[in-house]
Amino acid sequence: NANALQAEVEFKQQDIFDWSSSEGTWEVIVSNPPYVTEEEKKEMANHVLDYEPHLALFVPNDDALKYYEALADFALERLSTAGYLCLEINQYFGTQTVELLFSKGFQEVKLLKDFKGNDRMIVAQKSGL
């Protein structure tokens, strides 16, 4: 996509629980972390369960926001002053994820809905302009 759009974009793959080797400051961090709870597995279509790596999908029922907490810590450390953190989220944890980001120190947090009206995305700014 970056080549097709002739955009100056740098993509990084990072273990969010071990970012000690990460360097630099970022303007935007985008993540679609695992967010489906084990309880929700029974609601998922077989074609997803059969072909998607479960490591990329599921989180423990009792720690559903663990990736968001780690992403918030990373983003606050690595984002520029007015940088953005953009996240796909579990529709059932929209309010809790917003509260988590505010409690971590983000100044602006917007919860966005998908085309079906479900909470689906968060755009958070480290500090307001």
Model-found features: residue ranges?
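S-adenosylmethionine
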Residues: 1-128
